[in-house]
């Protein structure tokens, strides 16, 4: 069942509200959306859903980064359908969610700030004039306005679980294009993971049991790639149970498609998250030390 408007609460956490106001006020104006959205904050599940590329919004001060409007509707600006799926899944499994408030073209919330791909000047054939030759102060301005508040909101939610004595699970929601360049991507959904198999492996098994689904194991992207900042920073480094989901965008273009995938994934996750033994710190995370390159 799709979530109602009553379930949505958009807010800033105490941490983000206490951040120095200067840079953010200079970039974000009164008509701009907040840097993150908190959805279904009263969810009772010991899990947090995050969505890094939920929005195509660009601060008015950045003048759409010099792009035509139609370019901001492309996948280079956001993960199409991911926000709606994250909200529907949040309602389906009764877990809070934090969604990024700005386009990945402003600053990519799933990248470290020092990563060159955090501020993309050219992507999938599209030049982004407003990202060309960015100075370090300009990058810091965007980070302070959009990247840092989002990650502080996630950290605050996870800390609240810990204050209650819980080890929370983290579920990251993304979407991907059916074709990228000349590569045709046959998967309906991908399950991304690195060392911790506790959610990913049973989720793969449950999704593969669904008739007609092509399910990718670390496809079309790999959870072992070091660029997946949000999961690495908030979950993997802390030993929290976690998984990243990638659903093909053409599956998420209609309300019925969103509802179908929220039901499919939600049903599988509900069984997995019902296991109390899941909610412990993953001790094997130290196995990364001395390993080969990812």
Predicted features, each with a name:
Residues 2-170, 175-294:
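N-terminal catalytic or cofactor-binding beta/alpha core of small enzyme domains
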């Amino acid at each position: 069942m799709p979530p109602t408007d009553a379930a949505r609460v958009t807010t800033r956490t105490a941490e983000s509200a206490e951040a120095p106001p200067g840079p953010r006020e200079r970039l974000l104006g009164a008509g701009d959306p907040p840097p993150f959205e908190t959805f279904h904050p009263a969810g009772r599940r010991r899990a947090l859903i995050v969505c890094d590329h939920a929005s195509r919004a660009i601060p008015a001060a950045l003048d759409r980064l010099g792009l035509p409007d139609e370019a901001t509707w492309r996948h280079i600006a956001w993960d199409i359908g991911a926000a709606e799926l994250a909200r529907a899944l949040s309602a389906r499994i009764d877990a809070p969610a934090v969604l990024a408030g700005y386009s990945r073209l402003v600053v990519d919330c799933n990248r470290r700030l020092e990563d060159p791909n955090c501020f993309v000047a050219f992507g999938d054939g599209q030049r982004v004039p407003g990202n060309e030759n960015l100075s370090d102060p300009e990058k810091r301005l965007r980070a302070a306005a959009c990247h840092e508040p989002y990650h502080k909101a996630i950290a605050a939610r996870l800390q609240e679980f810990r204050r209650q004595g819980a080890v929370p699970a983290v579920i990251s929601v993304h979407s991907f294009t059916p074709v990228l360049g000349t590569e045709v991507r046959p998967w309906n959904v991908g399950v991304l993971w690195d060392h911790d198999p506790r959610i990913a492996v049973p989720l793969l098994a449950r999704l593969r049991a669904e008739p007609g689904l092509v399910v990718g194991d670390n496809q079309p992207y790999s959870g072992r790639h070091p660029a997946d900042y949000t999961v690495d920073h908030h979950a993997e480094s802390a030993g929290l149970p976690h998984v990243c989901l990638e659903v093909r965008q053409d599956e998420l273009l209609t309300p019925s498609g969103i509802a179908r995938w929220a039901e499919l994934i939600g049903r599988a996750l509900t069984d997995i998250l019902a296991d109390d033994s899941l909610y412990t710190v993953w001790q094997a995370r130290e196995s990364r030390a001395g390993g080969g390159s990812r």
